[in-house]
Amino acid sequence: MAAKDVVFGDSARAKMVEGVNILANAVKVTLGPKGRNVVLERSFGGPTVTKDGVSVAKEIELKDKLQNMGAQMVKEVASKTSDNAGDGTTTATVLAQSIVREGMKYVASGMNPMDLKRGIDKAVTAAIEELRKISKPCTTNKEIAQVGAISANSDSSIGDRIAEAMDKVGKEGVITVEDGKSLQDELDVVEGMQFDRGYLSPYFINNPDKQVAVLDNPFVLLHDKKVSNIRDLLPVLEQVAKAGRPLLIIAEDVEGEALATLVVNNIRGILKTVAVKAPGFGDRRKAMLEDIAILTGGQVIAEETGLTLEKATLAELGQAKRIEVGKENTTIIDGAGEAANIEARVKQVRTQIEEATSDYDREKLQERVAKLAGGVAVIKVGAATEVEMKEKKARVEDALHATRAAVEEGIVAGGGVALIRARTAIAGLKGANADQDAGIKIVLRAMEEPLRQIVTNGGEEASVVVAAVAAGQGNYGYNAATGEYVDLVDAGVVDPTKVTRTALQNAASVAGLLLTTDAAVCELPKEDAPMAGGMPGGMGGMGMDM
């Protein structure tokens, strides 16, 4: 095991604080509507230009081990805030830097770091309670668009696109962001349930222009095994033919004579059918088949449930208003399932989301909820160059997270004003001793910092603006984009409550850990061994006269 360097007390803390400041100073220039850009070097291709705090934080790695420890701890604040709320990373970094900077002064003067931390925690709890009180629900399209626009660095077109997408697919619907092919942003909406499996034979196509198979008012047969023998299918095919309606077969696979017979019947116009493979694999496939069954009001024909293909009846088949099957996707529109059953299924999947341990599982379960509850919207981001496309796409994703957070916990006045208003809950707060009181003061001072930074980035005098905003009430604040004092909620300058709350909580948590650090252990820099000496030059005696 390599030897380690152990550094104690102020020496350790001072170096770590240097790291905190390096990272925070690079991140905080991006805050607010007049935030500056940061250019990130790429090992290949052109550099990336961004105003996204977490993207800047992720790039920073410092040479000095102790400085790097401090920087990594604040990086954790940014990424945790991004994971939980999707936005507010720069605000969280600014808050963490302020709490660390103020706290270090008190620690250096001999105060007890543990009591300081208790005071900080007490103040943060009171501030969060106050934020919840002043929060208002975010319900209208206009409010959703405002949140999206602010999060996307005051780009109202992005806010409008997100509000439109949420309106189309509902609050629970899946909204994904992709690269567009034009200069304008576009919105594609897929209503109903879509899964990534297409027709098993191109002979099923009945709309040559769109290269899709369209089934109107079809039955849906769901089976969890392979179908290769047509005799298994005949009884149910005869019943469907009598009913005079088309049929969609979703099974693990349809092959051999079963597929050939379906194709021949389709070409001759005897029975309109389409066969597709079931989506997913393993247990996920079973779950998705069950989802489709509930959505269409049918049953999965599986041996586990005591049902067989030969004995299947029309009562066990699902139904839908319309189904479109393309080469790679199948879309079920307006399934005949009962709303109460669909709701119960959504609730069940949501419980699984809460219990999921991996991000991948959580993402897949959320997709299932969306497919059951609403639909899928795709925002295609348009830009002139690839560099602009990457930057804009990152902003759209941020804005999307922020709007979801706003719908979840409501909104507060933006521009750092909500934190100024939440200070009223702390102003009269008292700790158990003088050191805890100092901890409360640290948070009071830190909660001004986001507003100060927004104003500084806008090129104005921060102290004047902070004093003017603090003297006001409610949503009265400073709009840095226009340089005016207005009612920020009316002006559309709003932040999701969840973002502000998460930023404050995470900043206080990591800053508290830094303040209570008394030793740091890191690897000693490796000393490269000197290179081995070369061979002696020349070969004596060669070419000499004897």
Curated annotation (Swiss-Prot):
Keyword Ribosomal protein recorded: no
Locations listed in the record: Cytoplasm
EC numbers for this chain: 5.6.1.7
Keyword Isomerase annotated: yes
GO cellular component: cytoplasm
Catalyses which reaction(s): ATP + H2O + a folded polypeptide = ADP + phosphate + an unfolded polypeptide
Disulfide bonds: none
NCBIfam families in UniProt: GroEL, PRK00013.1, PRK12849.1, PRK12850.1, PRK12851.1
Family statement drawn from the similarity comment of this UniProt entry: Belongs to the chaperonin (HSP60) family.
Protein name: Chaperonin GroEL
